Every structure is written in C-alpha cells, then in structure tokens.
C-alpha cells in the first residue's frame, strides 16, 4: 500500500488526511494539538492511523504538512535575541515603521514594540545610491564596533539590512564576511538574501521575522525529521509554503520565512481545487478552526495572492495567499464585559483545556459549548472519535453567563452563536464578498476550507 498524507496543525486540533493511491479513497483523523510540544501530535497521529486503519508508517510514501511554529514564535515573542545592523543614521527603521497605529479610530492605540529593541540596533558607515552604485565605502571599523557592542548586549544573531541592498547586495555581503570573521559563533541574516524587495522597512521587517523564528523552526523540523524516521516513515517531510506551494524540510530550516503562513494557505488551496472541479467561478473559502476563522477570495478556481499579511502584530512582505482572519473559532471564549455586554473572542481555550464540554478542565464558555448546550453537537461522532462531548458541562458554563445576563441557557447559547457568526461575516467575509462583486455582478458561493 502507498499513502499520501497531509497534516494540518492548528491551534486546537491537528487533522490528518490519508489518500490511498491504489483505491483513490480518503481517510481522515483528528487529534488534539500540542502547543507545549510541537510535533508530538504528528507522531500521535501516525500511531493512531495504524490502530484505526491499519496503515503502517512504512506505507506513508508522501508526507506534507502546515505548521504554526513560526507564527506562534512571533506571537509569543519567544524567538532569537537579535541585533540589527543598518545604514548609519537609519537606526529607527523599526521604531518608525510606517507610522500606522493598530486602531485608526482609537487615539490611545499604540504600535507594537519592535522585535529588536533600539539599543540592539547599530548604524554602520557605508552608503549605496538608489541605483545600487556605491556612494560611501563600507567602513570595516564601524562593523567591528557594532559586532563588539552587539555581543556585549547578548545578541544571539545579527540581521544586516542596508539601504538599496535589493539593487546591490555587495555591502551586506561584505559586512556578513566581516561579522563571520569577528564573531564566527553568531549567525548572520541578510535582507538581500531573505527577500530582496524595494522599500527599506518592508525588507527589514521581513528579514527580522525570518531570523527571529529560524532557530525554533529549524529545531522543530529537525526533531520532526528524526521522529518520523525513527517511527519508520520513509517519506521525507515537506512543508506547505505561504504561497500554497511546497518545500522540503531542509529548505524550511534556512528559508523558514517562506512557510510562516503555511497553515492558512493550505486550506485555501484545497478550497480552490474543490471550486475549480465543481465549476464554481467565484467563491469565498471559510476555514473555521478552534482559534480563528479565515476567509479568502477564490476567482475562476484560483486563490488571490498578495503581500503584507499579518504575523502577530507585524506585517510580513512575502508573496502569500491573501487571507483575512478574525479571532473567532470553536474554542473562542464568550464573556461579559464591564457594561454587561456579551462578547465572543478573541481569546481561545485552545486544545488545553479547551471547551468545557471536552472534559479536559475547561471552565469558560466557548462557541463549541454553545452548540453543545443547544444539542447541535454531541449526538454523534465528533472529531473522528477524538472528542467526547459532555453537554452537562457545556450547559453549566453557559449557565454562568446566562445568570449574569438575566437570560436562559438556550437564549445565551444562541446569542453566543449569533455574535460569532455576525463577527465572521461583517468583519471579514463582507470585505471578501465586496472584492468579488467588484469584478462581477454574480453572487459568490461559500466553500468550507476544511
């Protein structure tokens, strides 16, 4: 037997799709994700497919998956301690950014703190013109001073992003050679190698994010490769890229910036394929997971692409499938604010403890609990037998909110669902729909992305 296996690792669940190349049939499996130990859910799934379907590790001849390790590293700010070398007098590139505030209607809204603090940003002497011609030679003494100060400040890696290096990387390459000679133990990352695009800030932040997540991603991929090999899986793991393509695990270790949005892209690519073979010209894919809901536009069977997708609090400027996300998924927590208004999300119960109805220690009502309290889930197999629904626990936590609101459990559960659906539609899907209507009068279809 020969199976092609696809694995989608989400914030709450990890889903397996197993395609039998001989019979052309599809099998599925769901396990809880392990954000505390990334990769453990993959090995658990490999074990369970053997128990449930009799598929042995040796039968897996193709293995690809999307991972959230990179994006979670940025969100949790657990990446490499970096220093940044910029062109002299341009130390504030990350501080100034594009001067946009997160909420344009809130004058108290604050921009996020950069991944590299200003005291770890060093200007070095040397300047290129806009056409790439050298204006001022690179000064080795200034590079040496920057290396010394970066090492003294505890830098674990150095990002070099100089003006106009997308036209001529000579100064960045020369600076890299100097750093490697002076501090061979410190890894160096170049903006011209990460993604050589015009505009200083966009190129710099993309290089910074790539360097920031690289050690954790590389460690994760190395561990996954070893674990799959030890389990007897002959296939070399592949990763989905942010643009919907695939890359090898070895490529992912050094080019992790290209797969940082791999999880969300996979669902859109799958939905686009279904739309194409179904003859649907224009549709919106909607991927509702445990933590978020992702909407994307598909036209003539093709997803739309762009740059500037959001990674945590920052934008990353690499080609990727255009996806709009809102923090409302099955595990999104319902709560009552100080004014007595019912809200849903963006905080999620995740996989641990998860919704109360999972019986894993959850004590706060979620969207899934609202469905369980109304009897809409839990009457048949849920999550391919990975989840057992306890409706009584769901009603108990929804009941706590009902008491605060002066409503019945049923009314409160229905309100939770209505708020979630309203948020998904008005905040994101409406914009996607508007994009479609701009190109055609035809109304779009909605395709589930998982």
PLM segments and residue spans:
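N-terminally biased helix-coil "hinge/interface" segments that flank
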Residues: 1-450
């Amino acid at each position: 037997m020969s199976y092609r296996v696809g694995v989608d690792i989400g914030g709450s669940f990890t889903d397996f799709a197993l395609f039998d190349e001989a019979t052309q049939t599809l099998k599925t499996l769901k396990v809880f994700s392990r954000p505390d130990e990334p990769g453990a859910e993959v090995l658990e799934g490999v074990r369970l497919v053997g128990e449930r379907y009799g598929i042995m590790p040796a039968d897996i001849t193709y293995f690809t998956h999307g991972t959230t390790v990179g994006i979670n590293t940025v969100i949790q700010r657990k990446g490499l301690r970096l220093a940044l070398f910029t062109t002299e007098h341009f130390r504030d590139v990350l501080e100034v950014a594009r001067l946009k505030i997160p909420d344009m209607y809130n004058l108290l809204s604050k921009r996020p703190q950069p991944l590299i603090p200003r005291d770890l940003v060093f200007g070095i002497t040397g300047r290129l013109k806009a056409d790439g011609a050298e204006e001022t030679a690179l000064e080795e003494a200034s590079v040496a001073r920057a290396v010394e100060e970066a090492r003294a400040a505890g830098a674990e890696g150095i990002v070099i992003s100089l003006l106009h290096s997308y036209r001529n990387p000579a100064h960045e390459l020369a600076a890299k050679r100097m750093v490697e000679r002076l501090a061979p133990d410190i890894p160096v990352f170049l903006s011209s190698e990460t993604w050589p695009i015009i505009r200083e800030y966009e190129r710099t932040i993309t290089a910074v994010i790539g360097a920031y997540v690289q050690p954790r991603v590389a460690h994760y991929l190395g561990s996954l490769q070893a674990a799959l090999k030890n389990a007897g899986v002959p296939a070399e793991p592949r990763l989905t890229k942010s643009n919907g393509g695939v890359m090898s695990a070895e490529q992912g270790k050094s080019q992790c910036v290209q797969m940082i949005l791999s999880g969300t892209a996979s669902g859109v690519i799958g939905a686009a394929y279904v739309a194409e073979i179904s003859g649907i010209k224009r549709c919106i894919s909607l991927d509702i997971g445990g933590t978020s809901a992702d909407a994307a536009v598909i036209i003539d069977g093709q997803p739309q692409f762009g740059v500037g997708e959001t990674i945590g609090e920052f934008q990353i400027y690499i080609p990727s499938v255009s996806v709009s996300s809102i923090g409302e998924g099955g595990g999104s927590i319902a709560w009552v604010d100080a004014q007595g208004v019912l809200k849903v999300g963006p905080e999620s119960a995740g996989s641990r403890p998860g919704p109360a109805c999972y019986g894993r220690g959850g004590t706060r009502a979620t969207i899934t609990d609202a469905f369980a309290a109304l009897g809409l889930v839990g009457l048949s197999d849920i999550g391919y037998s990975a989840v057992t629904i306890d409706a009584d626990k769901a009603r108990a936590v929804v009941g706590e909110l009902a008491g605060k609101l002066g409503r019945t459990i049923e009314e409160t559960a229905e309100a939770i669902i209505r708020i979630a659906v309203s948020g998904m539609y008005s905040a994101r899907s409406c914009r996607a729909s508007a994009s479609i209507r701009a190109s055609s009068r035809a109304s779009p279809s909605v395709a589930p992305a998982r």
